[in-house]
A protein has these predicted regions:
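Cleavable N-terminal export/targeting peptides
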Residues: 1-25
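Flexible, glycine-rich linker and terminal segments associated
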Residues: 258-260
């Protein structure tokens, strides 16, 4: 899991009304979110994460840039946020602090090599880079880049059901002394087109832990999109329920996007 995954889920829901469109689309959106939980520490963290994103998409290519701002309280001294979880955790209780600032910038490229046809899902390899732009000294990030490659399967069942599954391998940037490990990430779910305005999405999202000896994140996510225009401009709401000790207890986000 990572915080901005929920923006991606929202885009999947919106995209269900216009899969494989030939006309290029540009999207600008913003998704403020709030998460609360221990994330495997001895403290309760409160995280506000505001993700502003820019996307270009045509029939085969999707490019996306995410520029987040975040604020956290209850973060144990010496620990850092990384990829939607907390690393450099210590077993013993420790003092905590609060911090705010720009987060790690993400750049992603998805390319559809095979469109969905009948029982054959669309095959969509992808690559992502997490630039270590968040402050490592404040614990807002590790200060290191991550690199991720993966494969997505996106299916169409009738005119209303859009199952999807994605798996990826992330090469995790390792600050000195942290001993972080590379991880697998994965999700599976489906969007349901209720009508031309409303899209519902449910998803299980998980990953291995970047820090050995701790639980990886595992989350159940439900999302609702309301499309104001046929192109996909509209509003997005999601709720997250953490299922592991490495996840938040809960998360919620509401935002919107404009598609040109």
């Amino acid at each position: 899991m990572r915080w901005s995954h929920f923006v991606i889920i929202s885009c999947l829901g919106v995209g269900a009304t216009g899969i494989a469109q030939a006309a290029p689309q540009f999207t600008v959106g913003d998704m403020p979110s709030f998460f609360q939980g221990s994330f495997g520490t001895n403290s309760t963290l409160n995280i506000f994460y505001n993700d502003t994103y820019f996307q270009y998409q045509n029939s085969t290519l999707r490019l996306k840039l995410e520029v987040p701002y975040l604020s956290v309280s209850g973060l144990p001294n010496g620990a850092s946020l990384s990829g939607g979880s907390v690393v450099s955790r210590k077993g013993a209780p420790t003092q905590t602090h609060s911090a705010s600032g720009f987060g790690d910038v993400w750049l992603a490229a998805h390319y559809t090599v095979l469109q969905s046809s009948g029982l054959m899902p669309a095959i969509v390899p992808f690559a992502k880079i997490k630039f270590g732009t968040a402050s490592a000294s404040q614990g807002l990030g590790t200060g290191r880049n991550d690199y991720e490659i993966g494969m997505g399967l996106d299916e169409t069942i009738g005119a209303r059901i859009f199952p999807f599954a994605h798996i990826a391998y992330r090469f995790v940037g390792n600050p000195p002394g942290d001993n972080l490990q590379n991880i697998w990430t994965y999700n599976i779910g489906s969007s349901y087109l209720v009508n031309e305005h409303n899209v519902l999405t449910g998803m299980f999202d998980g990953a291995q832990s970047e820090q050995p000896g701790y639980s990886g994140p595992a989350d159940l996510v439900v999302a609702w999109n309301y499309n104001v225009t046929r192109a996909g401009s509209g509003f997005q709401l999601y709720f997250d329920k953490g299922l592991s000790n490495g996840s938040p207890d809960f998360g919620i986000g509401i935002g919107g996007q404009v598609v040109f």
